[in-house]
């Protein structure tokens, strides 16, 4: 089962989603050629990878994935992970 994306807001310049990951769910590593992405953890803990760096982040912590850099998220815990995500510019 895939993690769930809930759109909060979008404009022609950026969008904001909340990603919800249950235990074991992940967003596999991928690259956005022209978009920067910011992850901010709202609830739970997750393993975030950006480029060659991996970090476990919890509530109130975040990371930045610049355009062209591989990034992904794994919920490696037994609790739900909720993440606020900003992407700019909006590819839509």
Region roles according to the model:
Residues 1-29, 35, 86:
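A short glycine-rich, His/Asp/Glu-containing loop-to-beta-strand
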Residues 14, 45, 53-55:
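Well-ordered beta-strand scaffold positions
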Residues 26-28, 47, 63, 67-73:
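Histidine-centered metal-chelating micro-motifs
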Residues 32-33, 77:
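Short glycine/proline-enriched turns and hinge-like loops at secondary-structure junctions
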Residues 34-36, 41-46:
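Glycine- and acidic-residue-biased ligand/ion/polar-headgroup-sensing regions
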Residues 43, 51, 86-88:
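Cofactor-binding loop segments of dinucleotide-utilizing enzymes, especially the Rossmann-like FAD-
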Residues 53-67:
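Short acidic-glycine-tyrosine-enriched beta hairpin
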Residues 67-91:
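Ligand-binding loop in jelly-roll beta-barrel domains
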């Amino acid at each position: 089962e895939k993690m769930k994306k809930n759109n909060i807001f979008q404009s022609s310049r950026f969008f904001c989603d909340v990603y919800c990951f249950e235990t074991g769910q992940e967003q596999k590593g991928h690259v956005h050629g022209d978009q920067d992405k910011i992850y901010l953890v709202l609830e739970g803990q997750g393993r975030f990878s950006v480029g060659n760096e991996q970090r476990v982040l919890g509530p109130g912590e975040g990371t930045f994935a610049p355009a062209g850099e591989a990034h992904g998220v794994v919920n490696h815990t037994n609790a739900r992970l909720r993440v606020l995500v900003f992407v700019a510019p909006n590819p839509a």
